[in-house]
Every structure is written in structure tokens, then in C-alpha cells.
């Protein structure tokens, strides 16, 4: 059985990079991390962690065909509206303030413009409300943590070979 050349234009790594870059612009002093990484310890001080929650399809796929008019094969690009949810955990002395700032900015024209100009792989929709989710660390000390969910439309395109009649 032969393999099929399937392409994916926006990956999970792209979504994390875009979200992390945006967080770095808003909070330059905070370290930005991705959770679910093996053999990594929690950073010291204030930081923000990102955890993927859902990638939900909200529509059926729309198909765009690309063909050069000469060869027998081209590409079919499959696009649909998806919603990506990413949990953001804000830690440290400024956790509540930073979570509040992000929750307001996520639904703003500023956020939409920033992503379009700097990381055009997702469109921010909104943020859920920040909530306190304090935790006890490895030293049995309370850590300030505020959590929210960031909702966005990723601009994912899957492409597959398409035969054409020439």
C-alpha cells in the first residue's frame, strides 16, 4: 500500500508558539511554559503555563481545489471552523492581576490585530473568567495560581492529493 502525501498547515506547536508569544508581549517578566512535559520542574517566581484542553469542530469542511491545469494531480485543501481551548495558569504574586489583564485583552481588537500581524495561525475569541486555583507545592507551601480558559479559532488547513481530469 502506498503512502498519501497529507499536509497540515497549522500544528499544535504553532498554536502554542502563537499563544506563548502573545503572553510574552503582555507579561515580559513571566516565564511561559507548556505543561505535560516530562522531567521538567516548575519555574521559580511568576510564570504562566499553557495546557491544551479541546479542539472542537464547529462546522463541516469546506474544500478548495488547487490545480495547475496541466498535470493529472493537484491538491484539495480542507478547511473548517474549529475552536481550540487552552487552559492558562498564572502563578506568583501577580497571578490574579495578570489573569485579569489577559481575560480582558483576549476579547479585544488589540488581540485580534496582534495575532493577525504577528502570529496568523489563530483568531482569539474570548477568555473565560479567572478563578483562584491555589495549589500546594513540593515544599508544602501555598502557591498563588489563577486559571482561565483561552478560546480561539485555529486557522488549520489539511491538504490531500486530488486527481483531475485533464
Residue map of PLM features:
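Acidic/histidine-enriched, glycine/proline-rich intrinsically disordered or flexible terminal extensions
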Residues: 158-166
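Acidic-leaning, charged glycine-interspersed low-complexity segments
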Residues: 107-158
